[in-house]
């Protein structure tokens, strides 16, 4: 199955926050100044790049989405340089000019790949009238699918609570990359995206994944958030939502050269994907893939649609993710050459719940690789009735592929996966429920090949059918 990228071209996103200009002076250094014990750098290259909230907007525009940027600047060369750089990459700027303040600028001097000094030109915009920012947000709300608030604690988001309320009143999701430990100011946001250090600065040190989930869910409740995404560097990212099982996604980075701006890429891809009409789980899947690309580049960078598609589909080359049947067979051959035990299971997995997550985690513990075969939409309809599936095949596979326990996801069109299992011949075939092993599709073929068949219990009280019934009852009530 081909994973389709979101329709970014129809996504409109506004970014509001602290914009800044990053300046870089490069050159060789071979002597010490006679005036002071400091190196002399002969500057031969000068670069200017949009930073802060401007980098978020660039990440959104690089995907082909419609990006609008609002922020505070001075009336100076830095503001003009920002406007030109952003216009060149199709970011529509609507800056509020503050004559009494300079545009925030960070100048870095580098030699031999080492940063020697950073000079900051800023006064902060605290106390500046926020009304022009509110007016720009109000004017855009009817034409955007997401609002990003990018906080670098420079003053542009001093009235962040009013901005959140404006967007929520209009039904526009609000995504915030937080700064500092006062999360009270972000109350009512749709999604916060702190990194692990920022998260632990608020909730305390977390020794286990369970503690991250427990404290994250409390934070969601305390501040009336809809969701929380904790980015965890080499450990990937964790999505927490009330009433849903936590979604832990392992990192997809192959090599890490520079984490600068990775958070901007994550929130930019999240916003663009949501604005394109995709689910939050799908948005996290694509954001995780994009982060894996951007940390492999030097400096603040963006991700193109081609790079993102290669990152998603490229997992097949490294033995992971959503695959075609042919790709899966090659991956299994490679796994067996490495001496790995292959476990396989199957199901509809329509509305993923805690029972599914627990079952798949237990299945994964039985071997080195876990294959999940998923009924196609037509197969599901024949099995479950005309009202199913609730979620289409592509969405079901993407969410499964994002789970840490799952290595490979493949679909099948038939009523049972018997043909598929016979072609893969896993070392262990697993099924959840009250089946007898001989009743499980593909069991005879696996046994004939010397493999094992095992039945695992599902977690009590978890059922897609019950979830659907509860939703229907809540609507009636």
From Swiss-Prot:
**Which residues does the annotated region (Ribokinase) include?**
1-318
Which NCBIfam families would you find in this protein's record? Answer: cyt_tran_rel, PRK11316.1, rfaE_dom_I, rfaE_dom_II
Q: In which pathway does it act?
A: Nucleotide-sugar biosynthesis; ADP-L-glycero-beta-D-manno-heptose biosynthesis; ADP-L-glycero-beta-D-manno-heptose from D-glycero-beta-D-manno-heptose 7-phosphate: step 1/4; Nucleotide-sugar biosynthesis; ADP-L-glycero-beta-D-manno-heptose biosynthesis; ADP-L-glycero-beta-D-manno-heptose from D-glycero-beta-D-manno-heptose 7-phosphate: step 3/4; Bacterial outer membrane biogenesis; LPS core biosynthesis
Q: Name one Pfam family in it.
A: CTP_transf_like
Its GO CC terms?
cytosol
Q: What class of enzyme is it?
A: transferase
Q: Specify where the region named Cytidylyltransferase lies, as residue ranges.
A: 344-477
Known function: Catalyzes the ADP transfer from ATP to D-glycero-beta-D-manno-heptose 1-phosphate, yielding ADP-D-glycero-beta-D-manno-heptose.
Source species taxonomy: Bacteria, Pseudomonadati, Pseudomonadota, Gammaproteobacteria, Enterobacterales
Name positions with the PTM N6-acetyllysine: 179
- Gene3D superfamilies, A to Z: 3.40.1190.20, HUPs
This chain belongs to the protein called Bifunctional protein HldE
């Amino acid at each position: 199955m081909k994973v389709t990228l979101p329709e970014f071209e129809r996504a409109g996103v506004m970014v509001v926050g602290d914009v800044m200009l990053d300046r870089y002076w490069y050159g060789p250094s071979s002597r010490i100044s006679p005036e002071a014990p400091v190196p002399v750098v002969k500057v031969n290259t000068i670069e200017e790049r949009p930073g802060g909230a401007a980098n978020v907007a660039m990440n959104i525009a690089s995907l082909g989405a419609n990006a609008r940027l609002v922020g505070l600047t001075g009336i100076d060369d830095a503001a003009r340089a920002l406007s030109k750089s952003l216009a060149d990459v199709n970011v529509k700027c609507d800056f509020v000019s503050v004559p009494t303040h300079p545009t925030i600028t960070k100048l870095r001097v580098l030699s031999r790949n080492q940063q020697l000094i950073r000079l900051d030109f800023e006064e902060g915009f605290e106390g500046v009238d926020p009304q022009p920012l509110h007016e720009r947000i109000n004017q855009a709300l009817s034409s955007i699918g997401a609002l990003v608030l990018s906080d670098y604690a420079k003053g542009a988001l001093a009235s962040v609570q009013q901005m959140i309320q404006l967007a929520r009143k209009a039904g526009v999701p609000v995504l915030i990359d937080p700064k500092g430990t006062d999360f009270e100011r972000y109350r009512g946001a749709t999604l916060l995206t702190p990194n692990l250090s920022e998260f632990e600065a608020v909730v305390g040190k977390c020794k286990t994944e369970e503690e991250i989930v427990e404290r994250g869910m409390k934070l969601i409740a305390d501040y009336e958030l809809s969701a929380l995404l904790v980015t965890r560097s080499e450990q990937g990212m964790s999505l927490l939502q009330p009433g849903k099982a936590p979604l832990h996604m392992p990192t997809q980075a192959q090599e890490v050269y520079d984490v600068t701006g990775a958070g901007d890429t994550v929130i930019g891809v999240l916003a663009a994907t949501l604005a394109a009409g995709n689910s939050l789980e799908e948005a996290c899947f694509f954001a995780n893939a994009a982060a894996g690309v951007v940390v492999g580049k030097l400096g603040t960078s963006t991700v193109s649609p081609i790079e993102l598609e290669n990152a998603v589909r490229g997992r097949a080359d490294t033995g992971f993710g959503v695959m075609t049947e042919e790709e899966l067979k090659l991956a299994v051959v490679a796994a067996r050459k490495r001496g790995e035990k292959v476990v396989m299971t199957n199901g509809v997995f329509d509305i993923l719940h805690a029972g599914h997550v627990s079952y798949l985690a237990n299945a994964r513990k039985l071997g080195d690789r876990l294959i999940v075969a998923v009924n196609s939409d037509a197969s599901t309809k024949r099995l479950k009735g005309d009202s199913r599936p609730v979620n289409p095949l592509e969405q079901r596979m993407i969410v499964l592929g994002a789970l840490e326990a799952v290595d490979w996801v493949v679909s099948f069109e038939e009523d049972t996966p018997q043909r598929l299992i016979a072609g893969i011949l896993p070392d262990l075939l697993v099924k959840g429920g009250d089946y007898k092993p001989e009743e499980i599709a593909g069991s005879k073929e696996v046994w004939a090949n010397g493999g094992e068949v095992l039945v695992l219990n599902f977690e009590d009280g978890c059922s897609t059918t019950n979830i659907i019934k509860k939703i229907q009852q809540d609507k009636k009530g």
